């Protein structure tokens, strides 16, 4: 695994929730920066978009690396660091014996994390953290493009 971590900031959301949604991610490694975004024109949820962002970012990495992943979603951070192993052990049922919501994405995130050494961090959203703010802007762009307010429905840009 790489000694210099890849730093990833992610965000996702919907307008309204549920409704069309977008996700964004900023990946940094040394002097390299990659911006990613996408969206869903169909009805989705904030939580699904918050999960999609780290999945897409981790799946974009071409080799196993150390990752510091920042999210403003306690749902995502707690889910992957505290709850997912119990859900899996219980047949993807919650402690209340209800099916886990978004199980398809939790399983995909779990698989994406397995390729890398991922350390998860929670950050307060809209608090002036540059790459978190950029991930939010990218999620908005993904939403706008998904509903046809701009030209395409998913993209990647390099800075």
Swiss-Prot record:
InterPro entries: RNase_H, RNaseH-like_sf, RNaseH_domain, RNaseH_sf, RNaseHI. Pfam families: RNase_H (PF00075). Mg(2+) 2 binds at residues 11, 136. One of its GO terms (biological process) is DNA replication, removal of RNA primer. It is found in: Cytoplasm. One of its GO terms (cellular component) is cytoplasm. Its EC number is 3.1.26.4. It is an enzyme of class 3 (hydrolase). Its cofactor is Mg(2+). Residues 2-144 form the RNase H type-1 domain. Monomer. Belongs to the RNase H family. PANTHER family: RIBONUCLEASE H1. This is Ribonuclease H. It comes from Mycolicibacterium smegmatis (strain ATCC 700084 / mc(2)155). The lineage of its organism: Bacteria, Bacillati, Actinomycetota, Actinomycetes, Mycobacteriales.
């Amino acid at each position: 695994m790489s000694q210099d971590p890849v730093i990833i900031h992610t965000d996702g959301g919907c307008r309204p929730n549920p409704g069309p949604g977008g996700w964004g991610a900023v990946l940094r490694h040394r002097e390299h920066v990659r911006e990613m975004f996408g969206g869903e024109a169909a009805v989705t949820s904030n939580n699904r978009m918050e999960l999609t962002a780290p999945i897409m970012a981790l799946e974009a990495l071409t080799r196993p690396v150390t990752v510091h992943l920042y999210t403003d979603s306690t749902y995502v951070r707690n889910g992957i660091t505290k709850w997912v192993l119990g859900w899996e052990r219980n047949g993807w049922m919650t402690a209340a014996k209800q099916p886990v919501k978004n199980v398809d994405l939790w399983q995909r995130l779990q698989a994406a994390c397995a390729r890398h050494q991922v350390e998860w961090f929670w950050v307060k959203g809209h608090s002036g953290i540059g790459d978190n703010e950029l991930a939010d802007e990218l999620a908005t762009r993904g939403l706008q493009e998904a509903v046809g307010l701009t030209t395409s429905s998913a993209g990647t840009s390099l800075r």
